[in-house]
Amino acid sequence: KMFDTKKEKGEESYGRGENFMYYPKEETVKFLNRFVKKKKSLEEYVQLIDSPEKLRGLDFGCGIGRMTILLHEFDIDGYGIDISQNAVIEGKKLSKHFGFNLESYLQAYDGEKIPFDDNYFDFTISEGVLDSMPFELAKKLIKDIERVTKRYFFLSLISAESADMFRQTKNEELFDGEVEVEEAHEKGTIQSLFSKSKIEEFIKDTDFKIKWCELHTVEGCVNKYQHGRWYLVLEK
């Protein structure tokens, strides 16, 4: 089955520079320190995943590759894939700015099949990606993420508390369906909001189990609004 990945809308959004993340996400740094490799001093790390070889990680939906670069800062072989060619080109430039050459580590892909072998990665990270597509496509992709991942999958998803952020669902306290974004930011892209039960539905056909999970909710004090994100570590 072919899915509408909204690739064109994603490219337009990147073309406007809307999703260019030039700084690492704090939660990803915490995940690496808690589960993968703890930074002990400027030069020292304690590896938390047993492996005779250098660790390999996949940044799924890498955008301009700032988290892929972060993996290399942790001396991990980080690979990034994204459906946006614009983003990948920018990511290769950005990696040079940080003193890395990630020409062979960042690539655009078709949005359907991850171009790596089974269990190629010790872990995968994915920040705000699997919630930017139809749920049925996300369910297909998490199976492929499971295929290429040996152990951990760290991901973040927009929560049902974020109904407030979209015109179509503004009057609903909780909403865990899908909306096509009408607002200027990310216009035309899909947002799929997650409740706990939808997360369970999302992973039920995989061997992943929830190892760690937090729901972060934010409330506006000046303009009244609420939004939330799930942060999860899944383990095989």
Residue ranges, per PLM feature:
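Hydrophobic pocket-lining residues that define ligand/cofactor binding sites across diverse proteins
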Residues: 95, 133, 149
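Short, well-ordered alpha-helix to beta-strand connector turns
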Residues: 75, 121, 149-150
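A short glycine-rich, Lys/Arg-flanked "PGG" loop and its adjoining helix->strand segment in the class I
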Residues: 139-151
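A conserved beta-strand element that flanks and buttresses the S-adenosyl-L-methionine
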Residues: 125
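Short catalytic micro-motifs in class I SAM-dependent methyltransferases
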Residues: 128-132
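Class I (Rossmann-like) S-adenosyl-L-methionine-dependent methyltransferase catalytic domain
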Residues: 1-57, 63-113, 137, 153-236
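Short amphipathic alpha-helix with an adjacent loop that forms part of the alpha/beta core around
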Residues: 114-119
